[in-house]
């Protein structure tokens, strides 16, 4: 029941994929228990993603990490009319994927951008057309120095910029 509730309430899983996952979970239990799983969890102020490719994105990122290669992808944001807009005029990003992290119900890929010489993060549900590169990953020495808990606390849900103390 907890797994069904988690799937239904998770915003990074589309409605269609939620139904498919729950149907698979129902096959693992008796008919009586399956009927109990057919319920709706009410979650307020929650929009589910429309990006059906999130599962493939996660697989491609993990393949890049395990294959020790960079990945290429397009990245988008939503404009004020709630329309998808590709960033960088649709140009592909090339990043060395380091790790996937889940924060505040969003999956993030943390990776090294060799061009900017920075560790950056990208929401996985806003990544499109992910492909593995032939180039080896870079930035491992930067990642070894990274305190993931501190990075997540300072970065996720925030805009990038210099950290400044305010009096």
What are these regions (language model features)?
Residues 70-91, 135-148:
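Short, conserved active-site entrance elements at the starts or edges of catalytic domains
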Residues 109-167:
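Surface-exposed, charged, gly/pro-rich loop-and-adjacent secondary-structure segments at domain edges
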Residues 68-70, 101-108:
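Coil-to-beta-strand transition motifs
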Residues 1-5, 88, 108, 116:
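Short, basic/aromatic recognition patches that contact phosphate-bearing ligands
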Residues 91-94, 161:
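Short solvent-exposed loop/turn micro-motifs enriched in small/polar/acidic residues
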Residues 97-99:
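Short, surface-exposed charged micro-motifs
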